[in-house]
């Protein structure tokens, strides 16, 4: 993600090459960042909710845990998008460069959608591994 901070998310060279190779309209490096923005907080939120026993063991506890984790990730993503918007308003003329929308009117919504995908992937692919690691910590 620091690479995007160095070049700006819309101008990361590797993703410019990918854009040219696949004849894409935009540099999609920011989507990688937003995927991670959903993936990493999902595991953190899941662990906190489990360790703090927020969702009690029961018939639908795993489903509710997943709902809460995804909701937390989407709230985090929405807050980040609002923060981007506020910084863009405050900075004025360089708002387009900061936001990296590249003329895509649905950029904010797609960023949140990719964060949602990241959260779902984390829950789907890491829940069993995460549960096994957490069980080793319990006495």
Q: Which functions belong to the PLM regions below?
A:
Residues 1-39, 43:
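"…centered on the first transmembrane helix and the immediately adjacent amphipathic helix/loop
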Residues 1-4, 42-46, 72-84:
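Alpha-helical transmembrane segments of multi-pass membrane proteins
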Residues 12-19, 29, 74-116:
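Interfacial helix-loop-helix junctions of multi-pass membrane proteins
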Residues 23, 54-58, 82, 92:
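Glycine-centered secondary-structure boundary/capping sites
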Residues 36-53, 89-92, 112-129:
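Membrane-interfacial alpha-helical segments at the cytosolic side of multi-pass membrane proteins
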Residues 54-74:
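Internal alpha-helical transmembrane segments of multi-pass membrane proteins
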Residues 127-137:
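Membrane-interface capping segments at transmembrane-helix boundaries
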């Amino acid at each position: 993600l620091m690479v995007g901070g160095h070049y700006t998310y819309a101008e990361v060279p590797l993703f410019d090459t990918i854009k040219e190779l696949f004849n894409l309209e935009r540099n999609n490096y920011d989507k990688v960042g937003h995927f991670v923005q959903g993936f990493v907080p999902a595991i953190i939120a899941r662990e906190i909710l489990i360790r703090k026993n927020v969702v009690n063991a029961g018939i639908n506890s795993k489903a509710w845990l997943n709902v809460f984790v995804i909701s937390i990730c989407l709230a985090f993503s929405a807050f980040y998008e609002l923060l981007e918007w506020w910084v863009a308003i405050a900075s004025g003329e360089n708002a387009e460069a900061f936001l990296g929308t590249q003329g895509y009117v649905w950029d904010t919504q797609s960023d949140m959608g990719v964060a949602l995908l990241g959260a779902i992937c984390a829950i789907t692919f890491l829940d069993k591994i995460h549960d096994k690691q957490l069980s080793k910590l319990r006495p």
